[in-house]
Amino acid sequence: MRLDSVRLSHYRNYESLELSFSEKTNVLIGENAQGKTNLLEAIYVLALAKSHRTTHDKELIQWDAETARVEGRIHKRRGSHSQEIAISSRGKKAKLNHLEQRRLSDYVGALNIVLFAPEDLHIVKGSPQIRRRFLDMEIGQVSPVYLHELSQYLKVLKQRNALLKQLSMKGGDETFLDVLTEQMITLAVKIVQRRHHFIAQLEKWARPIHEGISRGQEQLVLIYRSDTFSNDLLDVEGMTASYMQKFGKMKTNEIRRGVTLFGPHRDDFEMEVNGRNVQTYGSQGQQRTAALSLKLAEIELIHEEVGEYPLLLLDDVLSELDDHRQTHLLDTMQQKVQTILTTTSVDGIAHETIKQAKLFHVKQGAVILEETSYKEIVGEKTDE
């Protein structure tokens, strides 16, 4: 699949912008704080209906404007379609082919993307919350039903926490708590099973990629972690029984503290390299390799699940990678995916993918198609 064009209206520092992209590689060149990342973020929002940089949608709306809007034209093997996301103080509206989608789970997945940014290193070394968000966003792209189940789970969890807080302060009948617990466990089992499947598929692709980047010196393993059951107990009956047993043990403490103390909203996944936890014991180089391997594996996993390669967004990551890791990433771009990347300069990047790219210059919220060639920009001699 590819993003043919995008149009922004009152999005962050862009009052109005319309761009058409190459089906291969597109490079946004500019100094920092000019709007390069804002443009990539807008494309991310177009695809997933939420930002990867903020949880406050009002930050996406240009100052003094009422509504931010991102529109795109997407081409797939079976045809083209339009997408639109509008963000205002009243909420979000998402449209496919000009028809409003009532549920975001019906919208997400129409445009598949993989974003790789410097902060993605936090997937490896950051908090469990960051890794759970990673799982939820990526699974949601290939499994709309997962987003629906997750939404239902979070609603029940919110109700359950409110009831637990009430019971902790005032006491009362605990019958409704048992009802909410059963509902939560039913949804939790479905969510965890889908997460396990995703982790297994991601590892299948990430292991050989990681081995290649590490020149055969390292083996990457992904492990889902739950404090309720072991990874060899994944059938519905066994997981349900484990959750119910956990609830029995935690009920008194949950009521005392007024909060839910078990469930997939508290789970995590670990990355091990040669048997050692890379989050805790890995060098920065190993952590970068693990993060890059996960992102390149995402590309293959999405292709396997939906039958088309996703759009790849790279936010100033080439400067963060050494030549060896950079080459692995650029080789993938050249062979398979449409890519939109940001950088302050293409100096020192001699890969053929960049030499053949469509170049844009970004300055103060304006984007201009670069008429000069890569060779002229980096000072190489052109053929006469």
UniProtKB/Swiss-Prot annotation:
Function noted in UniProt: The RecF protein is involved in DNA metabolism; it is required for DNA replication and normal SOS inducibility. RecF binds preferentially to single-stranded, linear DNA. It also seems to bind ATP.
InterPro entries referenced in this protein's UniProt entry, alphabetically: DNA-binding_RecF, DNA-binding_RecF_CS, P-loop_NTPase, RecF/RecN/SMC_N, RecF_2
Any Pfam family hit: SMC_N
HAMAP family found in the cross-reference section: RecF
GO molecular function: ATP binding; single-stranded DNA binding
Gene Ontology BP annotations: DNA replication; DNA synthesis involved in DNA repair; double-strand break repair; SOS response
Compartment annotation: Cytoplasm
Protein name per its UniProtKB record: DNA replication and repair protein RecF
Keyword field: ATP-binding, Cytoplasm, DNA damage, DNA repair, DNA replication, DNA-binding, Nucleotide-binding, SOS response
Disulfide linkage: none
Cross-referenced CDD domains: ABC_RecF (cd03242)
Transmembrane segments: none
Binding site for ATP: G30, E31, N32, A33, Q34, G35, K36, T37
GO CC annotations on file: cytoplasm
